[in-house]
Curated annotation (Swiss-Prot):
InterPro entries: CsbD, UPF0337_stress_rsp, YjbJ, YjbJ_sf. PANTHER family: UPF0337 PROTEIN YJBJ (PTHR34977:SF1). This is UPF0337 protein RB10934. Belongs to the UPF0337 (CsbD) family.
Length: 68
């Protein structure tokens, strides 16, 4: 979670990376997230029909792989 402050601060630049990882997310979804980690977990969970812990795991992978 230590990178999340940086991710939140650079969300506009990182939205493209998020959309590459989760191609089903719309621009509206990503705007709604607005850099908020819990919101991203919720949107990923909703769009992909995942359990919360699986969505959380995917967001952690994004967090550790993003260039931030």
């Amino acid at each position: 979670m230590m990178n999340w402050d940086r991710i939140e601060g650079k969300w506009k630049q990182l939205k493209g990376q998020a959309q590459q990882q989760w191609g089903d997310l719309t621009d509206d979804d990503l705007d709604r997230v607005d850099g908020k980690r819990e919101e991203l977990v919720g949107v990923v969970q909703e769009r992909y029909g995942l359990a919360k812990d699986e969505a959380e795991k995917q967001v952690q992978q994004f967090e550790s792989s993003c260039n931030c």
